């Protein structure tokens, strides 16, 4: 499955209700997730994008992988306090999200995805 580009509406249907996030985290997904916060003009984001797309295929049915354009979805970026891009947000089942700054290599991202599905 290809990566899914999230808008505010998609986020509220698949990830969490924005108005509830200030008081509690309640993940709506049925599998762990990864969200890649990016911008089209960002060089490191452009280098990371094909890796994220490959991982979406590799982890299809195990981890849902999303992308959020920070320029188009500023509110979503603010929710996770995205200050630099790329930023990756790992969402385990039943736990709080893990926010990591900067581009990572495929191997490092795979390690973290594998930890999500254990």
Where on the chain are the PLM-derived regions?
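N-terminal targeting signals for export/organelle localization
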Residues: 1-12, 114, 118
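Thiol-based oxidoreductase modules, predominantly thioredoxin-like and allied folds used
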Residues: 5, 37, 49-56, 60-75
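A short beta-strand-turn-helix
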Residues: 6-33
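Conserved hydrophobic/aromatic "anchor" residues
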Residues: 11, 37-38, 91
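Short pre-active-site segment immediately N-terminal to redox-active cysteine/selenocysteine motifs
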Residues: 30-33, 37-41, 84
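Cys/His/Pro-rich metal-binding microdomains
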Residues: 43-46
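A short glycine-leucine-enriched loop at secondary-structure breakpoints
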Residues: 79-83
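Non-catalytic, surface beta->alpha helical segment in thiol-disulfide oxidoreductase systems
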Residues: 84, 89-118
């Amino acid at each position: 499955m290809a990566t899914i580009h999230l808008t505010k509406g998609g986020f509220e249907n698949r990830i969490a209700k924005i108005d509830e996030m200030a008081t509690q985290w309640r993940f709506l997904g049925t599998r762990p997730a990864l969200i890649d916060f990016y911008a089209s003009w960002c060089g490191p984001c452009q280098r990371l994008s094909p890796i994220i797309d490959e991982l979406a295929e590799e982890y299809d049915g195990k981890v849902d992988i999303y992308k959020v354009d920070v320029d188009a979805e500023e509110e979503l970026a603010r929710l996770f306090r995205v200050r630099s891009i790329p930023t990756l947000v790992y969402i385990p089942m039943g736990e709080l999200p893990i926010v990591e700054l900067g581009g990572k290599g495929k191997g490092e991202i795979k390690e973290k995805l594998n930890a999500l599905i254990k």
